[in-house]
Amino acid sequence: MALLGHSCSAPAAPPAPPVVRRLSDSTVQVAAGPQYKRSGLHNFFWGRHYRTLWALPVTVPVVNLRTAVPGGLIPVREGGSFQTKNLRLTDRNGVEYVLRSVDKDATKALPEGLQNGPIGRLMKDQTSVINPYGAYIVPRLAQAAGVYHTNPRLVYVADDPDLGEFRQSFANALYLLEERPEGDQRTVASFGNSSRVESSRKVFTNLLASTQFRVEARQYLRARLFDMWLGDWSRREDQWRWASFEARGGGIRYRPIPRDRDHAFFKFNDGLFTHVIGWVKSNYQTFDEHIRLSDVEGLNRAARPMDKSLLVYLSREDFRQVADSLHQQLSPTVVREALSVWPKEVYGLVGAEFERKLNGRREQLPAVADKFYSLLAHDVEMPGTDQPERFVVDVPAPQQVRVSVYQRHATRPDSLVGARTFRADETVTLKLFGLGGNDVFELRALPAPGISLGLYDGAGQDMVLGPAQPTTATRTTVFDSGDGTILTLPAAVKVKRYRPAADEFDAAGWLLRHRLY
């Protein structure tokens, strides 16, 4: 038992400075994390993960801040997430770059008193679940997939005086150097040459403020299926930036820029304890040759609020078409070329393994997309905005419901925002949220009991208008906030008076509810 307890505590000592072998003035050979190499007993309980890869010395270029880009780079600010150390830099034109540490430290999320204890040491040890060179191969794959991407370069930062005040914290380590996807990016093709790249907080605020702002849903779906192919389960809203473009008919259209690929190619379930934890925390899915079709929900849990909102108008056929397109574009040749950018030591150790796994997962993309659609279609929430909308509900066929959402205009015909037909064999509950603005819910027909339909009026002076013909068999409910909503409904429609929670009332509440703020 003492031996088991010793193994479980993961008593990793603080890492010593890495052994650096100078090959030339511009090249070194160094391991990303030799401290993750552990005993066989420890690996049995806590997993082999990518420990061998972390301990492997690789040949890497030394970055010179004065020559890294034309005119050089100037460090301006230290930052980072709860596990990655970042250094923000700018070039002579004010374009921002970032150095992101290859090694991670998740203990920063713990209270200070726990960081150096057994829990902290175990968390630090489990950095070995990350492929230290995974993000480095993503750009070539993303380019082939038609997905926007950053362009990380694997570099070694020596004891460079140009680091200035950040020299002590950032010298003598491996980093990924990449553009920072923010602001004016007209010179970066992989960001769509967008003149304005925005944060998720800004974009979701705009999406619920007005129908003039929209995300290109098929492009977002393409990026999400690409995430699943990479096994990247950590796709919460802060992992995205958004390239904005002016639409032909007016308004703004957003295309996604995924960033931070730390959890792509995750390897977790190869230890006794981590295998058990993986079944409890089903989002911790290992990058294997086959995607776990039985738990596509777990793989996508972090992004579920975004997925439910941004993919709400897409059909199963849309999902199939995008998956088939990705299957065609991510060919074995593309995979082989992408892997070839790895340092030769890395490619020699795991190149064949990754080629096999990526090609195997590619064959599953259509099935994964179909499962993904089914999960999202089961319970649907369709929000409006804080401007006036008209929700039109019709029944095109038995056991079907069609919802069309229009932006209301005072002096011209209403304009279609989006429409989708729901089927009772796919969708159990369908909820429409007016949010702010003076909205109209127009029930031209009532759905059969196969689909439960809920209408939430929200803020503003709203109207809910039912069909003239009597209907008895329906599960349609209007949730009336009691703020003066006009109701003209047949008796078959239930009306429930309720005090709406803030998260059902307007755009700000919706963002809070789904943690998209």
Regions inferred by a protein language model and the residue ranges of each:
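A conserved hydrophobic secondary-structure block that centers on an alpha-helix together
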Residues: 129-139, 144-151, 209-238, 243
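Bacterial signal peptide processing site
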Residues: 7-11
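Extracytoplasmic
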Residues: 82-84, 237, 427
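Bacterial N-terminal signal peptides
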Residues: 1-6
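Juxta-kinase regulatory segment immediately upstream of eukaryotic protein kinase catalytic domains
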Residues: 31-67
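C-terminal catalytic region of ATP-dependent kinase domains
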Residues: 127-128, 244-420, 424-431, 437-454, ...
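Conserved ATP-binding subdomain of kinase catalytic cores across diverse folds
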Residues: 62-198, 252-253, 257-297, 421-422
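ATP-dependent phospho-/nucleotidyl transfer catalytic cores
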Residues: 157-232, 245-255, 267-270, 333-341, ...
